[in-house]
Amino acid sequence: ELEEGLTHTINYFSDIPLFLEVEASYSCNYFCPRCPRQVLGHEGRTGFLSDELFGILFQEVKKYRIPSINLSHGGESLLRKDLPELIRKSKDNGVLDIMIHTNGSLLNKQLSIDLIQSGLTKINFSLDAVSPQIYGKLRSEGNYEKVISNINDFIEVRNKIGRSYPRIRLSFVVCDENIHEQEAFYELWEDKVNVIAFQQFYDFSKGKDSDGVNSSNLGCVPY
């Protein structure tokens, strides 16, 4: 149903945006050393997109039949207590593909149920490690064991409910600190989630340089 709806939209409404990315939360509960928030000086940016702006957004989404939306960008999406409701409103206004990105630290079983039943179609967990030691280097505020437990609980809840959605994606941004864990990461998660994504580093501090990025000094960005 989702694939058919997206195909219909692409065929008949290709003159409108097919995808929107909305920063529902500007805030983040982590302070990751290589995150663009720190590199670009956005670490002090906090707050949430207002209900008023979301109301306008949903009107436009419905009017133009936007098929796909990501309710995350640079902040931590789960800091919004009303996130499941925003997902439901997206669905009620005709969005077919609704995704979020999260570090997973704020999940619990009830929130997992709420997200799964809200109409969410994709969730991405930014993990980047397979050990507490490496996770601690990349996620200075993070608790690896808690995050892993939260992700496993989410998988278990989705399977118990009997849903095939949301599709679960784990991202691993390859850098000097974690490259030796890449294979173990795949082996740990290959039978548990729908997608495992290995991504290359990008140093946002050098992104302003028109001469390009030095591939030997790349920085992590969660996807």
Question: What do the predicted segments below correspond to?
Answer:
Residues 1-122, 133, 137, 141, ...:
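Conserved alpha-helical substructure of the radical SAM core
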Residues 23, 44, 49-52, 56-59, ...:
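Radical SAM enzyme [4Fe-4S]-AdoMet core and its adjacent flexible, acidic
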